[in-house]
Amino acid sequence: MQPPRPACQDEGTHGKEVCMLLIQKKRLLVVLIVSFLSILFSAGYAFRIGMLHAHKGSAETILFYGFVAAAFHFILSLYLMLHAHHKKKELLKLADMLRYGGSIGESHFKKFGVLGTQIQFLLKELLALSAQKSLKIAALSGLQRALTELIPTPVIIIDLNGTILDMTKGARKRVQRADKTLTIEHIFPATDSTRAVQEAEKTHTPVEQEGGIVFIPVFSAVGNISHFLVDISKQPASDEPLSLA
């Protein structure tokens, strides 16, 4: 999908063309001040030349129109600054609506002309990517559940804090977990997930701890450890699963 072309657009049903110009406030102030002083300087210089050549009437007329132009320039500059401040407040309001998930109509974006069109386009793209990512996560979660039901090897899935996230069918035969916030240390007190993280970050290999419990690191796409697969197959199996509340 290609982004919309940066061109003027109609605002609502009023037929007004909206073109946004992005410029730093300091630069705009410099341009306005320089142009304002240029008007005054030009009028003053023309008045001086006219007086030197004995054209007093023409010189005074030029000076008068110079002051009128300077006054008009000042009023226009003030309007531009106030309008820019108003647009800034509207943009911050739009950002708050996006942050808190409020419903945003197309009219809110049209107020910003081409900039609003680009923001709306980027927002739609981000929402589409977010939806795709959610579907991918849901699919991976389903795949994880299917694999944990099929794998007979007793393996427990934990995060970097040692909290148990899931376990395979073989592990559930050995451990009954009632508390969903249970950590691996609750089941096997001799283990230390923090030490396992430290060692795995150095070696990038599985870490075996007391009792033959093996912490197998799972790496993310950027190479960081995201989870651990804890292999407890070397632990002696009991007739009744260990029940932990």
UniProtKB/Swiss-Prot annotation:
Ranges that cross the membrane: 29-51, 61-83
GO cellular component: plasma membrane
Keyword presence, Transmembrane: yes
Primary location: membrane
Mode of membrane association: Multi-pass membrane protein
Intracellular or extracellular location(s): Cell membrane
Lineage: superkingdom: Bacteria
Protein name per its UniProtKB record: Uncharacterized protein TP_0138
Key words, A-Z: Cell membrane, Membrane, Transmembrane, Transmembrane helix
